């Protein structure tokens, strides 16, 4: 019971309470904490633990957050121009993959964008399969990307 509440809404808007809001609460061995998020679109927050970096990576609306897993303190916040579709975390990668409708981002633990790829079709599905990031477009096309480099995978 208890724990710190961090409101990250002001990072998104000067009036975050006018937007869609969600709270993410973590109860763990290191204690409890809660973050309050804001989005211009209706979404449900999803998260994955990036254990090698000690971050809980959260996607909500247009934003991805790298939060300290034990405290919820933001390490980085990344905004996309289009809604986020998925995120992928692996101890085999030096970055987290953030998939938006029109772009793929590789974001390092300090929030630096390692690489970015723009897509010509809206991405409707993304899966990490056989060490390839497989993207499905609105038009039905499928594209495979090397998740480490962002280059086309054969």
Tell where the protein language model's regions lie, with residue ranges.
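Repeated scaffold domains used in trafficking and secretory/extracellular systems
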Residues: 2-13, 36-53, 79-93, 119-132
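Aromatic (tryptophan-biased) beta-strands that constitute blades/sheets of beta-rich domains
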Residues: 22-42, 73-80, 112-124, 153-154
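Short loop/turn segments that connect beta-strands within the blades of beta-propeller domains
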Residues: 20, 52-53, 60-62, 92, ...
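Short loop/turn segments that connect beta-strands within beta-propeller blades
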Residues: 69-71, 108-112, 146-149
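Extracellular-facing segments of soluble proteins and assemblies that are Gly/Ser/Thr-biased and enriched
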Residues: 49-78
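WD40 beta-propeller blade core
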Residues: 65, 105-106, 143
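Acidic, small-residue rich beta-repeat scaffolds with periodic aromatic anchors
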Residues: 125-154
